[in-house]
């Protein structure tokens, strides 16, 4: 009989270090934040083609890497994906490839990050990030009180300003987030 933990966490990540979260798999990731430090991970308990997650952490270097990967499991133990929650008291660099995912970036401190794949992204008002690179097919919801600059080809609401530097959602305010769209991507922005 095989037994794998469907939930694990590390709440002891130091706020003295930045962390690089690396995920690369053909499954769904639901990413959210929580008040505190560290991370939690659990399975999306529905049929799928994804193995249970495990995390490998480096203890040296800057940023310190946390790599999520699939455990090799029987096809009977495959799940729909993973729910991952990140502590809002750590600084994260995201490098994620996933499919049909929901990425909630509402209350996180991020260094420049990359998201690849497909799904929905929510940029929350408490997001702290300089730049985000998107590659793939995404629908991105932007709250009215977050000023962003979108560089590259993307579908944006009609009321956004198409300036020489890119598309601005709040042209009366200084943008605080730069989102770069990689060529060949299909990204739709909407106000939320």
Model-derived regions: residue spans:
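Membrane-interface segments at or immediately adjacent to transmembrane helices
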Residues: 2-40
């Amino acid at each position: 009989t095989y037994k794998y933990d469907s939930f694990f966490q590390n709440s002891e990540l130091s706020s003295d270090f930045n962390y690089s979260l690396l995920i690369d798999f053909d499954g769904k990731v639901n990413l959210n934040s929580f008040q505190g430090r560290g991370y939690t991970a659990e399975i999306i308990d529905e049929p799928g083609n994804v193995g249970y997650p495990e995390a490998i952490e480096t203890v040296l270097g800057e940023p310190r890497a946390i790599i999520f990967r699939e455990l090799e499991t029987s096809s009977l133990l495959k799940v729909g994906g993973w729910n991952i929650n990140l502590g809002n008291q750590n600084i994260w660099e995201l490098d994620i490839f996933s499919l049909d995912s929901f990425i909630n970036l509402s209350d996180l401190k991020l260094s420049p990050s990359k998201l690849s794949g497909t799904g929905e992204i929510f940029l929350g008002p408490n997001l702290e990030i300089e730049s985000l690179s998107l590659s793939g097919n995404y629908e991105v919801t932007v709250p009215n009180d977050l000023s962003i600059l979108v560089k590259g080809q993307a579908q944006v609401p009609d009321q956004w300003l198409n300036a020489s530097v890119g598309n601005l959602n709040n042209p009366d305010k200084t943008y605080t987030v730069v989102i770069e769209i990689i060529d060949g991507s299909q990204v739709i922005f909407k106000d939320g």
